[in-house]
A protein has these predicted regions:
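Substrate-binding pocket helix/loop in short-chain dehydrogenase/reductase
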Residues: 67, 95-99, 103-108, 205, ...
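Alpha-helical segment proximal to the catalytic Tyr-Lys
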Residues: 127, 172-176, 237
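Short C-terminal tail/terminal secondary-structure segment
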Residues: 91, 95-96, 148, 229, ...
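Active-site helix of classical SDR
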Residues: 122, 159, 167
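A glycine/serine/threonine-rich, flexible loop-to-helix segment
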Residues: 176, 188-212
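Conserved glycine-rich Rossmann-like NAD(P)H-binding loop of the short-chain dehydrogenase/reductase
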Residues: 28-42
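Residue(s) in the substrate-gating loop at a strand-loop-helix junction
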Residues: 143
Length: 253
């Protein structure tokens, strides 16, 4: 197991990719804090049934006290924090529009969760990573949209571009502490959240997305978990400040 004796926090772990990340980390031996605004009991049940260790907690990543409580729970439950997966983000349910017609309230909410949330959760755990003496790994979930440009979703695009910039800045600051900071930028994964985003155009979107990649199929959850495990483990111990594109080569077309 690549992550034995490690402790990982995964935000947005109630469903979809966050749940998949949590289960994959646990399968490699990590103890997992499954954190979400929604209930994570199903995620924890899946992990513990498979023989892993996990606890659930409710967190609002845009609230500093909530993030601090999440970090404290991790320390109380498992004694350390080695890995943070900043996965919580607003995507499903966003109302797309031309940039000049985007709803201002929605814009502000996206920035609060996707940008401020990444900052607050990272800030909450970095002290524990430093005091642990072994460094750590922070993995920020960005998006292909940040570098490719997604029409009718400038709020989401801007937030994920900020995550890439934050990844680079944090990597520079935390390198002396042996805390690595990397980002993963996937293309669209066919989760329930993606289906909610595209709505009635979901089936057409699946076909169009697959056709515009060097590898002509849709991205699957398992395509991402391998990258997450790599970045969380000592296999990437000299890798930091990088954005890993997991997009089937669509960026090259």
């Amino acid at each position: 197991m690549q992550l034995e004796n490690k402790v990982a926090i995964v935000t947005g772990a109630a469903r979809g990719l966050g749940r998949a990340y949590a289960e994959a980390l646990a399968a490699e031996g990590a103890a997992v804090i499954a954190a979400d605004l929604n209930d994570c009991n199903d995620t924890v049940a899946a992990i513990t049934t498979a023989g892993g260790r996990a606890v659930a907690t409710q967190v609002d990543v845009a609230d500093s006290q909530s993030c601090d409580a999440m970090a404290s729970l991790a320390l109380d439950a498992f004694g350390r924090v080695d890995i943070l997966i900043n996965n919580a983000a607003l995507y499903a349910g966003l109302k797309g529009a031309r940039f000049e017609q985007l709803d201002e309230t929605q814009w502000d909410k996206v920035m609060q969760v996707n940008i401020k949330g990444t900052w607050l959760t990272s800030r909450a755990v970095v002290g524990a990573m430093r005091s642990g003496g072994d460094g750590g790994s922070i993995i920020n979930i960005a998006s292909l949209a940040a570098v490719f440009g997604l029409p009718y979703g400038l709020d989401y695009v801007a937030s994920k571009a900020a995550v890439i910039g934050m990844t680079r800045g944090m990597a520079r600051e935390l390198g002396p502490d042996h805390i690595r900071v990397n980002a993963v930028a996937p293309s669209a994964v066919m989760t329930e959240g993606t289906e909610e985003f595209f709505g009635e155009k979901f089936e057409k979107a699946k076909t169009v997305i697959a056709a515009n990649q060097l590898i002509p199929r849709n991205l699957e959850t398992e395509d991402l978990t391998g990258t997450i495990i790599y970045l969380a483990s000592d296999a990437s111990r000299f890798v930091t400040g990088q954005t890993h594109m997991v997009d089937g080569g669509s960026w090259f077309l």
